[in-house]
Amino acid sequence: MIDKNFWQGKRVFVTGHTGFKGSWLSLWLTEMGAIVKGYALDAPTVPSLFEIVRLNDLMESHIGDIRDFEKLRNSIAEFKPEIVFHMAAQPLVRLSYEQPIETYSTNVMGTVHLLETVKQVGNIKAVVNITSDKCYDNREWVWGYRENEPMGGYDPYSNSKGCAELVASAFRNSFFNPANYEQHGVGLASVRAGNVIGGGDWAKDRLIPDILRSFENNQQVIIRNPYSIRPWQHVLEPLSGYIVVAQRLYTEGAKFSEGWNFGPRDEDAKTVEFIVDKMVTLWGDDASWLLDGENHPHEAHYLKLDCSKANMQLGWHPRWGLTETLGRIVKWHKAWIRGEDMLICSKREISDYMSATTR
């Protein structure tokens, strides 16, 4: 699993470090002693986890657009990283209907820019390309998708992630082929996670942030698709998988340069209705929800991942169940409302996760 000693002094470059997942990953890496530089647009929300935990004081932060190839290349070349996590993205399904050009240019060409930079700069040993479970051609199957299933995507966001996977595959085959690993020395993996939730997410049109905003303002939560099933998991679950993949790529790049799924156990793939009912109970104070009867852009109703490969080959397993995850989210958010030091609270969350046993 995660080897904290491995990360001591490692030079790590994170794109998208100002986002929800990127902030949690950057904080975790700095906690383990890594020297971290981030490259991203300004924090996408106000408030943001990046600002609240004062990440600017813990790492080098370069504000820039992943679509600006020269700026990205110069930033990476100056830093000379050993490991790269590529998270920069337009991450919202509904926004992708409104901004398809920006979604594709960021998620597809951004990936091209990152991988071309890795090819040109050299001396980078491990690249973890973060996409999404929505990269798969979703047929609303009752079983989970495996890493060798076809890429697809109904909406611009999901399809852009499928395209990003194809980009990574092409670069791996053409420039970072495991068969020629001794020549190039680069391990390149793509990682795919389900619906990631946790404290510190204020994004628009995401279920948990929408619920918390409504509760905080004493308003009913408006729910679009109560019967949609998603593979819900605490943000630290897939991040732990990404970290393990990076470790393996660094030491055995040829063996682990492929796609990896990171999702919850089957019993934690629950309906939206289940989530909101649990959150109502955990929050208390007369919290409630209401069904939105309006028509909305298409979103998948059923999507699960098969994580057998990560379980068997990486020794990765989920540690927190859905009920504990939701409880931790409410606890984290109420601590923020009370004005507690969220850097301390977030470090404690990481420590709790690291010490938890697999379920």
From Swiss-Prot:
- Keyword Heme present in the record's keywords: the answer is no
Q: Its Gene Ontology biological processes? A: O antigen biosynthetic process
Per its UniProt entry, what is the enzyme's top EC class, as one word?
lyase
GO MF annotations in UniProt? CDP-glucose 4,6-dehydratase activity
Question: Its annotated pathway?
Answer: Nucleotide-sugar biosynthesis; CDP-3,6-dideoxy-D-mannose biosynthesis; CDP-3,6-dideoxy-D-mannose from CTP and alpha-D-glucose 1-phosphate: step 2/5; Bacterial outer membrane biogenesis; LPS O-antigen biosynthesis
Reaction(s) catalysed by this chain, per the record, are: CDP-D-glucose = CDP-4-dehydro-6-deoxy-D-glucose + H2O
Q: Which cofactors does the annotated protein need, by name? A: NAD(+)
Q: The organism sits in which domain of life?
A: Bacteria
Q: Look up the EC number in the record and give it.
A: 4.2.1.45
Membrane spanning stretches: none
The alphabetical list of record keywords is: Lipopolysaccharide biosynthesis, Lyase, NAD
The record's Pfam families line, in alphabetical order, gives: GDP_Man_Dehyd
> Is Membrane set as a keyword in this record?
no
Leader sequence segment: none
The family note in this entry says: Belongs to the NAD(P)-dependent epimerase/dehydratase family.
- This one is known as CDP-glucose 4,6-dehydratase
Task: Report the source organism.
Answer: Salmonella typhimurium (strain LT2 / SGSC1412 / ATCC 700720)
Its taxonomic placement starts with: Bacteria, Pseudomonadati, Pseudomonadota, Gammaproteobacteria, Enterobacterales
